[in-house]
Amino acid sequence: ITFDHVFAEHKDTRIIIATFASNVDRVQQIINTACKYDRKVVVEGRSMVNIIQVAQELGYLNVPDKTLIEIDQLKNYPPEKTVLITTGSQGESMAALSRMAADVHKKVTIMPGDTIIFSSNPIPGNEKSVSKVINELTAKGANVIFQDAHVSGHACQEELKLIYSLVKPKYAIP
């Protein structure tokens, strides 16, 4: 399932995407798709905000002007014109998405019809906490997508070979 597919199918709802803050390429895909569908983007979660800011400063993330808005500006836009990129894809109790699901987030309330995408599979051991968050979101009437939206953040064998040939380390542990 691609972001383009999800955005096209859920054009009348707010979209919230939980992903790893460190997966800058995935964040870029989300921003590109949000721009294509004329949506404003809110970044939520301390690690997400910090990493995106650094990635922009270093030129690793291309964000068109006026795409990102502050969370306080959400109320100025119709829900179907917004996307939230957030932490919490692993069900971490203090992450932004978990706080939204538990109704303790100070600025975002999950509404019936919201589309929530878990953009990564649960790491072994996190299944119970991820399921808890999914159940809380579903109970609030959100449409939760958690299958077929995963991309690996790890290098494949050929990518490792390329890195080793470029860096030429004395020792390497993949």
Predicted regions and their residues:
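Acidic/His-rich, metal-assisted hydrolase cores and their charged scaffolds
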Residues: 1-174
